[in-house]
A protein has these predicted regions:
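Juxtamembrane intracellular "pre-TM" segments in multi-pass secondary transporters
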Residues: 1-30, 204-217, 221
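A single, central transmembrane helix in multi-pass transporters
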Residues: 9-69
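Substrate-agnostic recognition of the 12-TM MFS/MFS-like secondary transporter fold
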Residues: 20, 24, 28-32, 64-76, ...
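Helix-to-coil boundary motifs at intracellular loop junctions of multi-pass secondary transporters
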Residues: 42-50, 81-82, 102, 131-136
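Transmembrane alpha-helix termini and helix-breaking/packing motifs in multi-pass membrane transporters
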Residues: 44, 157-181
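Structural signature of the two symmetry-related core transmembrane helices
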Residues: 85-100, 178
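Helix-loop junctions at membrane interfaces in 12-TM secondary transporters
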Residues: 102-114
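Multi-pass alpha-helical transporter architecture, strongest
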Residues: 176-213, 217, 224
Length: 225
């Protein structure tokens, strides 16, 4: 007789560091998605000439490119001994930049927010990857990396949807996206301290989950040198 195959391997729990890093990265990705689409709608909505539209898109695009380049260099050189803490700080800075852009409502501050956000998302993603690499056994990492990418893409889509649907005044757009970032930041901070604003989503977790396999040597982690 054939017996049905049952996968008896327990599901690998996620520790507080990974949960915090996921919440922070998702919060930042919302603003990344927003900034990818919103400036184009702002440029097209105003009765400006082609050069003025090019100025808006070029300034924000250049700022985002410079920020991404700087963030990748910084993440390669940083010692990610406390990746969750790095993500928390990046989320605070990004949320503050979005609020500043909402208050100022001008192009230069929006470009500065794009630069900060692009740098922060590169550093935060490297920190999340370091948490997954260090906190999970090898058998669970591939699945965890795949699921985290799916969650981050969903957060990006949410931010992009806000950029498409919201009114095309800079202060209105950044106010709307800040209204999403602030709860995300709050959840990130609460998760870092071991709680959760949403029952069942990150609360009451150990800093490091109990692993079902050997934990890799921190010295071998990317950025540890």
């Amino acid at each position: 007789l054939r017996h049905p195959h049952h996968d008896k391997s327990p599901r690998q729990p996620l520790g507080r560091n990974i949960i915090t890093s996921l919440w922070g990265n998702c919060t930042i990705k919302v603003l990344v998605g927003f900034l990818f689409l919103y400036p184009a709608f702002v440029a097209k909505s105003h009765d400006a000439g082609a050069w003025e539209q090019l100025k808006i898109l070029g300034l924000i695009g250049a700022a985002a490119g410079i920020g991404n380049f700087a963030g990748n260099i910084a993440s390669a050189r940083l010692k990610l001994g406390h990746p969750a803490q790095v993500v928390v700080r990046a989320t605070v800075i990004v949320t503050a930049a979005a609020i500043a852009a909402a208050v100022a409502g001008n192009l230069m501050v929006a470009a500065a927010a794009a630069l900060i956000t692009s740098a922060a998302t590169a550093i935060s993603k490297a920190s999340l990857d370091a948490s997954l690499q260090h906190d999970l056994p090898e058998a669970s990492r591939a699945s965890a990396f795949g699921r985290s990418e799916s969650v981050l893409q969903l957060a990006w889509v949410v931010g992009g949807a806000v950029g498409v649907l919201i009114y095309t005044d800079l202060w209105v757009g950044f106010t709307a996206v800040s209204a999403l970032l602030i709860p995300g930041l709050a959840q990130t901070l609460v998760s870092y301290n071991g709680g959760s604003l949403i029952p069942g989503f990150g609360g009451n977790r150990p800093v490091l989950a109990e692993q079902e396999g050997p934990r890799p040597d921190p010295a071998a982690m990317p950025g540890a040198r």
